[in-house]
Every structure is written in structure tokens, then in C-alpha cells.
Amino acid sequence: MSRARSGKVNKNRHKKILKLAKGYRGRAKNCFRIAIQKVEKALQYSYRDRRNRKRQFRALWIQRINAAVRQYDITYSQFINGLKQANITVDRKVMADLAVHNADSFVHLVELTKKSLAKTA
């Protein structure tokens, strides 16, 4: 019985890792032992940052909405509270987009929230 060798399997495994390490600096792009460490760390960073990206975008949307509503003498927290009282369900991503690209619609939202806040006060 012939001896089983892992030549093809190892070559494909090395090729896969070195393909992922393409563009790295120094020996990380062509030395397998270093490349595998760098690729694993890069994959850890990408996993972590896919979650961080969601937090950062939400913070950006909130900042944009806050800046836009302060032009109309209302704070972000009052604006969100007014939206909830008026039963308006628009997510922050859409509101930030309205504030930047479609100011007329956003002004209408602000007016509606001010009316709903005035009713409760």
C-alpha cells in the first residue's frame, strides 16, 4: 500500500492563505508562517469592525439628526420623544437622509413633532 502524502492539500492550503495575504507588507505576503498569523489577525479585525460599523453609523445618524433639528429650536431627545408621541415610525437612517437630502420633508416631520409635544405640555 502506498504512503498517503499531503502535497496537494498543503499546496492548496498555502495558496489559499497567501492569496488572502496579497497586498501585505514584507514577508507577510509570501512567508506562510507569518502570513497565516497576519491573515488570522486581519479576519479578527474585520469581524470586530463589522459590528463597530453599525455603532458608528448609528452615532453618525444621531449627530446629523441632532444638528438638523437644532436649527428649528428643538433637541434630539425632544424630537425623538415627539415622534413617539405622534406615532411616527421612521428609523434614524431615513431621518438622517431626509435631513441631508430632502429638507422640506424633514421640516414637516419637525413640525409634526412640535405639535405633538405642544399637546402634551
Swiss-Prot record:
PROSITE patterns linked: RIBOSOMAL_L20 (PS00937)
Entry keywords, A to Z: Ribonucleoprotein, Ribosomal protein, RNA-binding, rRNA-binding
Pfam families, sorted: Ribosomal_L20
Keyword Transferase among record annotations: no
GO-annotated biological processes: ribosomal large subunit assembly; translation
InterPro entries: Ribosomal_bL20, RIBOSOMAL_L20_CS, Ribosomal_protein_bL20_C
Top-level taxon: Bacteria
The keyword Repeat is assigned to this record: no
GO cellular component terms given for this protein: ribonucleoprotein complex; ribosome
Gene Ontology terms, MF aspect: rRNA binding; structural constituent of ribosome
CDD domains recorded: Ribosomal_L20
Family: Belongs to the bacterial ribosomal protein bL20 family.
Function: Binds directly to 23S ribosomal RNA and is necessary for the in vitro assembly process of the 50S ribosomal subunit. It is not involved in the protein synthesizing functions of that subunit.
UniProt-recorded name of the protein: Large ribosomal subunit protein bL20
Organism in which the protein naturally occurs: Orientia tsutsugamushi (strain Ikeda) (Rickettsia tsutsugamushi)
Gene of this entry: rplT
